């Protein structure tokens, strides 16, 4: 899965390959195609940051049109409550799923454990939960410790994101 840098409300640096709301359609499409081609083969994309871009329905439609053409899925990190990603994905027949919990906004052991337990509770209640984390040393260490015991101790099974994708009708 390609974490695609997208414009945030806070105007954080996106780095090379980022997509923003000021781009014309041709620039947006060219930048997106370059990113997708640079990291192929991939199966899907998620937004890295992106609170401003994912709230822009027109640009989400542009994004989903390219993902649909390549039969790629989209994982919405839900960095804003105003995200339009799921609506655009459904309209353009792109398989998608949205984040339920961020694991590592707080990287302390207590913070990681709190969010992990929140995800477990949601998974039990809803039948699934999408937990997004980053490759921080603290997060990796936490997951190395907790994942091996997940099914036996917690009664929750880890699955790939593809198993949770919502297929548009």
What are these regions (language model features)?
Residues 1-169:
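Catalytic-site microenvironment of enzymes
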